[in-house]
A protein has these predicted regions:
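Condensing-enzyme catalytic core mediating Claisen C-C bond formation in acyl metabolism
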Residues: 1-44, 145-194
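Buried hydrophobic positions in well-ordered alpha/beta secondary-structure cores of metabolic enzymes
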Residues: 12, 69-72, 115, 135, ...
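Conserved catalytic cysteine-centered active-site region
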Residues: 23, 33, 76-130, 141
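Phosphate/oxyanion-binding active-site loops and adjacent basic polyanion-contact surfaces
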Residues: 43-52, 112
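Active-site glycine-rich loop that binds ribose-phosphate moieties when present
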Residues: 104, 114-116, 135-160
Length: 194
């Protein structure tokens, strides 16, 4: 549809406030291969790699190694693996097989909140003292395109990336601590389609 193509060009080339966006693709043309098998393979290939890199970066910044962790929590909404992403991360980081591993799937844009709430709960219950919290999205594995302007704008906004943080009951003296005082989230089912 020519109107859709014009909208896509305006969003991607215009002054939209987005300075960079990363996609875990070798070429932009790959983004238009939207068969279910390709999308699943894209997620299975890139989500573990992005999560592992974010985890390694967080561990380096915290002056820790993976054996120092008691738990790992991963959130995503752009794909599904069974067993989950934590099984891939466990393998790539050489995690203790008895470690607490939690996969949170389907929380959408606010996934960091339940992820951090679970980390907070594990720490304050005494079940863990160091929890690696990871959010990873491979939006190129969840692409859906049609002529709806909302769908087109969404496809142009989101990229493929991961972020991670180490949550601890004992903050490091070398790093500025962030203290969790309280967390709250609200679910509004009537706004699910926004």
């Amino acid at each position: 549809n020519p109107t859709s193509q014009i909208l896509l060009r305006r969003i991607l080339r215009g002054d939209n406030g987005i300075t960079t966006r990363s996609l875990a693709l070798d070429s932009v043309q790959e983004a238009f291969n939207l068969t279910p098998d390709i999308l699943q393979l894209r997620f299975q290939t890139h989500a573990p790699a992005l999560a592992s890199q974010a985890a390694r970066n967080a561990l380096i910044k915290a002056d820790l190694v993976s054996q120092d962790l008691d738990a790992v929590i991963i959130s995503t909404c752009t794909g599904y693996l069974c067993p989950g992403l934590t099984s891939y991360l466990s393998e790539s980081l050489g995690l203790d097989p008895s470690m607490i591993l939690l996969d949170l799937v389907g929380h959408g844009c606010g996934a960091a909140i339940p992820n951090l709430r679970n980390a907070h709960a594990l720490i304050h219950s005494g079940q863990a003292s160091k929890v690696l919290s990871i959010c990873v999205e491979v939006c190129s594995a969840a692409f859906y395109l049609d002529d709806d302007p909302g769908v087109l704008i969404s496809a142009c906004l989101f990229g493929d990336a991961a972020a991670a943080a180490v949550c601890s009951s004992r903050p490091s003296a070398a790093h500025r601590p962030i203290q969790t005082i309280a967390m709250q989230s609200t679910m509004r089912p009537e706004h699910r389609d926004l």
